Amino acid sequence: MNVHESHPRRDRDLENITLEALTVPWRLQFRVDEALYAVNPNGWTCYIEERDQRCLRVTNNCVISLLKSDLKRRYQTCTLNIGIRVAVPQNYVVILAKLTDPDPTSRGIPIIQVANGLIDSGYRGSIRAVLFFEKSCIIPKNGLAIRLSLVKLASPNLNTRVLFNLSDITPHLECGPDFSTSIETAVRLGSGETKPLLPPSGGGIWAGTGCRALACLYNDRVCKASHYTSSDKNIAFVVRYNDSTSVLGLKDFPTAEDETFVRFYTSGQFATLIPFFETFTPKRTEDAAYDIAAPGDIRLGALSSTTIMIQQRYVCMDDSVIPCIFGRSSMNLRGLIIIPSRWLPNSWLTITICNLTEMTVMIRCGDRIAQLLLVDHESATLIPPTNDTTGMFPTVGKCRRPGASVGEPKWRETLEFDTEAYSSERQFSGFGSTGI
């Protein structure tokens, strides 16, 4: 083939293009997804860490004075503008944490606590850290170091549900005995038929289940499956009773016109016991995390803490998703700290709230108290490796070199942030993951 010869068909096509069409300007729009940052040199120094280019280290290059205005309070809270603006792709989040200082007192550095924070991909304002300190103090030059880690988010199918054994979940449910009794009764009344069953008591709800009807599936292949999906939102749960029988919980009694299709299969992917969005609030595209609402009223005494359990659990056998719990910036400013932690598989969702104020605090049912972050396994080295529920303000140490990764974005500094950073819906509103 002679590459220098004109293709006859192409020549004929070109002849059909009119002169007017050739004069129409061609408009090409494009965007490059990058991890951009801009730094205000007046007060702060920022550089990319050599061991892991997903990490930015920010240090103060001038003295910072912190004044405790309320001497009656044990902890003073304030926000500190660290002079950095970032723009990252929508499938990433920036996690803010203080770097560990092995011996701060020998260098005359006061003990300052920094709340972990999440910065959404759509936020374009200056990043602010929430600080806690017990007395007025002066932070010397280079006395405060903060890391901004570029963390990849996971995108699992959130409609996937998991089958759990009745014996595994009943001991942990608040309604355990009633739930178990209802399932056993339904299996006995089902008599080998798959049909919706009303509670024998006639009370309208099967005790402990929140369901108006239960249906038994007498099929050993279903019982061998691990996951299921269904577009029918009437399905509250599917529980494996034994090796040959599973029970579906139906929120309302189905009518003759209703058709329910359930796909059962075996997988190692992320799946929840209860519908995901019955526990977590849907988020915008630019948001990193899913809000978690208080399951009931919570009363927190002064300088106290409490741990609450939310009836939701998950499995992820392939370890592709690492669910993490973080606090909210608005809660931090009120002196209410959510201890950052990993949500462990096959465990109920537990959240520890600490009240660092001298006042009793009431949290109402439905108030947003925490956030769920679904982290991709490739970013596992950038989050706490264990489920430490004792440290309110986790710090990060020396970077560990990541394994070989292809296509991971790296930080790039820009002097034209407003021009190069792609537009976002949120822009400058609030700070943290969901704003104040």
Curated annotation (Swiss-Prot):
Cofactor field: Mg(2+)
EC annotation from Swiss-Prot or TrEMBL: 3.6.1.23
BP GO annotations: dUTP metabolic process
Domain of life: Viruses
Name of one Pfam family that matches: dUTPase
Catalytic reactions of this protein: dUTP + H2O = dUMP + diphosphate + H(+)
Keywords in alphabetical order: Hydrolase, Magnesium, Metal-binding, Nucleotide metabolism
UniProt-recorded Gene Ontology molecular function terms: dUTP diphosphatase activity; metal ion binding
Positions of substrate binding: R328, S329, S330, F431, G432
InterPro entries per the UniProt record, alphabetical: dUTPase-like (IPR029054), dUTPase-like_sf (IPR036157), HSV_DUT (IPR034745)
Role according to the record: Involved in nucleotide metabolism: produces dUMP, the immediate precursor of thymidine nucleotides and decreases the intracellular concentration of dUTP to avoid uracil incorporation into viral DNA.
Family the entry assigns: Belongs to the dUTPase family.
Name of the protein: Deoxyuridine 5'-triphosphate nucleotidohydrolase
Organism listed in the record: Gallid herpesvirus 2 (strain Chicken/Md5/ATCC VR-987)
